[in-house]
């Protein structure tokens, strides 16, 4: 059950930059790390492989590809420039030509399916967006890859909006030239059997055929590469809204096949500073949760990495980082492409990014005739969600104009950062400031608009799970904010990002 986290998107460092302000809006992210607690030793059991590394089972060759010669694979590594160029300043509105990154007006035709293949999905994405597929993989015996992490990033650079869509590895789809299979087998089939464009090509076509989303660029990283990315950035501060406990190898150097080397590990709610190994565990583990919950945590790490890249001045380090990480990340984006995208950083914030997850009710658990447990798409529900994810959001524009200030009125470290992150998921830009006291028993929402827009006020209360009695009218023409939220000891940090889709 290996799955590299989505954070390898540093390969798209221009996209990382284009998602500027991620983490905590205009404010500096809290620096207090959440406690990491070792709970208990692993139970006695018969020796088994690590719960994250089941024995590899060689897949049978797809019958429709028996007569295709397996090619010698060439690496998809980008070519680094001999002497990295400096990042151009972004002091004015970007005038750089992004046309080379956008798709052509006419989308390429979908591959034809067999007579028993389902009808292809209607293409949902237009030429106004640039669509990236972020792939997390580990290399299997024999040199093949299994892509258990797939996140689609849809970027509208001119409109300063983006969407992220997590795809579960067990999604049951039609793979062109192969047939009905789990989506995480598409890349391997494309690599092994000479599909046009290799693994990335077949995965692109599979996503277009089943989800109706055109993929323009891809980036893939393995586990070791992910650790290196995080450590290169000096670690990452991840807002952990809900405590998370799962089995973890006590030390990365220990034998994962010895069950005594595992113990339950807990990350408490708070802003947790993670190195590469801890971030990898947090984003890929699922023994005590599910693939859907893992997708949520992967997007948490991805968002945090975006913000970390900016807070560590990575904009000016893009050429050097590109050179340093070129052997870690396989991508079709060149340094010039990334620098072009980096110019759009000032116009985007974390609140500009909407998070989507292909999970129930968009899929249902199903067992194939061969006995495989998969996730079957619920076509009507899934299509509606994908239409929303691939369309610019007017609600996001409205909410982004609302100024919300967050204060921590308690002695609980990082509470304001968690609330700000929660509002960012819902599309609200936030700013952090110091409270006048740390003994607020109950949270307070000060409405400086004097109820001019009750829908926005009620939305804030709903998102933060606060009662209407928390609202206080406080007209102040010089406030600089529309709403001030002072968090009290009654504030509950845990929330579900999928409930905040807007």
Where are these regions (language model features)?
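Bacterial N-terminal signal peptides that target proteins for export
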Residues: 1-6
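Non-catalytic, solvent-exposed segments at the cell envelope interface
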Residues: 20-502
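Bacterial N-terminal signal peptides
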Residues: 9-17
């Amino acid at each position: 059950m290996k799955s590299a986290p989505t954070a390898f998107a540093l390969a798209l460092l221009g996209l990382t930059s284009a998602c500027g302000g991620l983490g905590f809006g205009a404010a500096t992210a809290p620096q207090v790390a959440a406690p990491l607690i070792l709970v208990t030793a692993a139970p006695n059991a018969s020796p088994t492989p690590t719960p994250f590394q089941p024995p590899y089972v060689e897949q049978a060759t797809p019958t429709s590809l028996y007569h295709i010669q397996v090619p010698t694979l060439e690496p998809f590594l980008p070519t680094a420039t001999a002497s990295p160029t400096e990042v151009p300043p972004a002091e004015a509105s970007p005038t750089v030509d992004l046309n080379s990154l956008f798709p052509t007006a006419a989308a390429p035709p979908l591959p034809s399916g067999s007579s028993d293949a389902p009808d292809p999905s209607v293409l949902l994405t237009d030429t106004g967006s640039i669509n990236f597929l972020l792939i997390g993989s580990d290399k299997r015996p024999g040199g093949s890859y299994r892509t258990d992490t797939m996140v689609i990033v849809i970027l509208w650079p001119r409109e300063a909006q983006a969407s992220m869509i997590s795809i579960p590895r067990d999604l049951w789809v039609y793979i062109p030239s192969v047939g009905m299979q789990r989506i995480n087998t598409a890349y391997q089939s494309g690599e092994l059997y000479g599909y046009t464009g290799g693994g990335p090509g077949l995965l692109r076509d599979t996503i277009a055929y089943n989800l109706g989303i055109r993929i323009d660029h891809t980036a893939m990283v393995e586990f070791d590469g992910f650790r290196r990315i995080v450590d290169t950035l000096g670690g990452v501060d991840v807002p952990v809204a809900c405590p998370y406990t799962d089995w973890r190898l006590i030390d990365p150097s220990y034998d994962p096949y010895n069950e005594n080397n595992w113990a339950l590990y807990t990350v408490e709610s708070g802003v947790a500073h993670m190195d590469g190994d801890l971030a990898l565990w947090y984003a890929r583990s699922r023994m005590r949760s599910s693939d859907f919950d893992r997708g949520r945590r992967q997007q948490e790490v991805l968002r945090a990495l975006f913000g970390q890249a900016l807070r560590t001045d990575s904009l000016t380090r893009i050429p050097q980082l590109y050179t340093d990480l070129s052997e870690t990340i396989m991508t079709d984006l060149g340094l010039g492409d990334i620098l072009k995208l980096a110019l759009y950083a000032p116009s985007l914030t974390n609140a500009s990014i909407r998070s989507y997850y292909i999970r129930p009710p968009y899929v249902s658990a199903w067992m194939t005739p061969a006995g495989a447990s998969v996730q079957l798409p619920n076509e009507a529900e899934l299509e509606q969600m994908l239409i929303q994810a691939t369309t610019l959001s007017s609600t996001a524009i409205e909410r982004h104009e609302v100024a919300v200030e967050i204060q921590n009125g308690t002695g609980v470290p990082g509470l304001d950062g968690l609330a700000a992150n929660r509002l960012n998921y819902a599309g609200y830009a936030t700013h952090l400031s110091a409270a006048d006291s740390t003994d607020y028993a109950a949270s307070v929402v000060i409405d400086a608009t004097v109820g001019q827009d009750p829908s926005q006020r009620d939305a804030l209360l709903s998102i933060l799970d606060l009662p209407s009695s928390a609202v206080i009218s406080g007209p102040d023409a010089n406030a600089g904010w529309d709403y001030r939220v002072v968090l009290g000891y009654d504030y509950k940090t845990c929330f579900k990002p999928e409930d905040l889709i807007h």
